[in-house]
Design a protein with these regions (language model features):
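A conserved structural/catalytic subdomain of Rossmann-like adenosyl-cofactor enzymes
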Residues: 215-474
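Conserved S-adenosyl-L-methionine
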Residues: 121-223, 228-235, 287-290, 296, ...
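Non-catalytic accessory regions of SAM-dependent methyltransferases
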Residues: 1-37, 462-474
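Conserved phosphate/pyrophosphate-binding and hydrolysis machinery centered on Walker-type P-loop NTPases
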Residues: 101, 125-129, 263
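Amphipathic, well-packed alpha-helical segments that form the structural scaffold of globular domains
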Residues: 109-116, 136, 140, 162-163, ...
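Long recognition/docking surfaces used for binding and targeting
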Residues: 15-120
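Short, solvent-exposed loop/helix junctions and linker helices
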Residues: 10, 84, 263-267
Length: 474
């Protein structure tokens, strides 16, 4: 890959490898049609080192077989990476290496990681594998579930959902996997990623999932959401439909009380997901801290109050910065929705209605060597998953559910009444805190006494003129 990237941009090099993996691993009904380029034909063309047409042969195969992306504005578009001149020897070796590879998953994961880093601007990013595994384990998808990722990127959360269920039920899970992505390139990558792994999924044409409500409800929703997304709009607005005054009753069923701000999609995403959940559905999604912590009176605290009133919030987990994408320095929280938190057969043994679990995993990360990059890592992901499972009373097959108890500085279970007393804040660092040491407690008491004394002195200064006036009147 390093040698190839000397001849072409890193993103194009990775897309070329992905395309060749796709050609080599996905069977095609039309492969025996005369005149149609096939993987076997391409592999045979690499045997003659003097043949200078290998680049054209690769481009021909990719153009014919790569999945076209249906865009409502541009029509069907095949995004074929350009094979640069001077790379014939490397391309020939690459085709042969891919043909002989026994395990493609590690190469596929590395390509997706490199591609995410190369496109780490704005909302073009893919979910790291360790974070995807944490999100899926928190959602607990089951065989037969309908799973949606409305911002699917490379399809990593759909891949992980399939793996999670496959590991528990064996071959051929019957779940339905649906993804949608705004960017044509990412949409094509998602199709190839799933197809190379032999996973059946429906990747919808590119578009903004927020434009309209989801047409169907889903049992599981997973999303590594864009933070503070601007420039989103409902479909009637993008098509020049009539605008309504802010005071008008909302027509969109996703926002039953007040429409979200058009300049920031955070609240819109939360309500879009909540509206798309089936009656016993669960959702796990990443959201910027401010949606959990803002206390200034306004629509955000009111939204949190409604979510808690509906008993939809199951857990909020504070994560470190830069574990959800290579360029995302903003600290995020992982939100877990559950429309049925009751104890029941096939689920957990603890009735958690009217309760929320807060996990403070802000420092749970591994620093990658010689880099600013971080990752959760397997150990930290497992700690979070184990804590949530214990709180739910949820056990793996054949084992008893682990016990749960609050752990200062790590986790705390709170009632909705307690949360209401904190102005409906959902910030884990406000609840799962370390106990104060004796010195810290003493210092805090001194500071409180100083503030009270200053307030009393201010009151005395305000009263002094009135006292003097009263004395003169005697």
């Amino acid at each position: 890959m390093t040698q190839l990237s000397r001849h072409m941009p890193v993103s194009d090099a990775n897309r070329l490898v992905l395309g060749l993996l796709y050609l080599s691993r996905v069977p095609r009904a039309a492969a025996t049609t005369p005149g149609v380029p096939t993987w076997a034909w391409l592999l045979n063309r690499t045997t003659d080192p003097r043949d200078a047409s290998i680049r054209a042969d690769v481009s021909k195969c990719l153009a014919h077989w790569l999945p076209a992306v249906e865009d409502r504005d541009a029509g069907a578009t095949s995004l074929v990476p350009t094979v640069p001149s001077g790379s014939d020897r490397l391309v020939r070796a690459l085709v042969r290496a891919i043909a002989s590879a026994q395990q493609v998953a590690p190469l596929l994961d590395q390509c997706l990681s490199d591609l995410s880093a190369a496109h780490a601007d704005g909302d073009k990013y893919f979910t790291p594998v360790d974070l995807a595994r944490l999100m899926v384990s928190a959602a607990v998808p089951r065989d037969g579930n309908r799973v949606l990722d409305p911002v699917c990127g490379s399809g990593g959360l759909l891949v992980e959902s399939h793996r999670y269920v496959h590991d528990r039920v064996g071959l051929h899970p019957t779940m339905s996997l649906v993804g949608k992505e705004r960017h044509m390139l990412s949409s094509q990558v998602a199709r190839m990623n799933l197809a190379v792994r032999g996973i059946a999924a429906q990747i919808l044409p590119p578009g903004d999932s927020l434009a309209v409500p989801e047409p169907e409800q889903h049992d599981i929703i997973l999303a590594n959401l864009p933070f503070n997304q601007s420039g989103w709009a409902r479909e009637e607005e993008t098509q020049g439909g009539p605008s309504r005054p802010a005071s008008a009753a909302p027509l969109d069923p996703r926002w039953p009380e007040e429409p979200p701000s058009p300049g920031n999609a955070n609240a819109a995403w939360i309500q879009h997901i909540a509206h798309a959940l089936a009656p016993k559905g669960r959702a796990v999604f990443l959201m910027v801290d401010t949606m959990a912590s803002t206390r200034k009176a306004g629509p955000i605290p009111r939204l949190r109050e409604r979510l808690l009133r509906d008993d939809l919030v199951e857990s909020v987990i504070a994560l470190p910065a830069r574990v959800s994408g290579p360029s995302r320095d903003t600290t995020p929280c992982l939100w877990v929705f559950n429309k049925d938190k009751s104890a029941r057969p096939g689920w957990g043994t603890h009735d958690r209605r009217g309760q929320v679990l807060f996990i403070n995993a802000r420092n749970a990360y591994e620093q990658l060597p010689n880099s600013r990059a971080r990752r959760l890592g397997e150990k930290n992901s497992a700690s979070i998953s184990t804590t949530l499972a214990a709180w739910r009373g949820l056990a793996e097959a054949g084992s008893a559910p682990p016990p749960y108890q609050d752990e200062p500085g790590w986790s705390r279970s709170c009632t909705v009444t307690e949360i209401a007393a904190h102005e409906y804040s959902l910030m884990p660092t406000s609840y799962a805190v370390e106990p104060l040491s004796r010195e810290q407690d003493t210092r805090g008491r001194v500071e409180r006494l100083k503030r009270e004394l200053m307030e009393r002195l201010e009151e005395m200064r305000d009263l002094e003129p009135r006292l003097l006036d009263a004395l003169e009147e005697l």
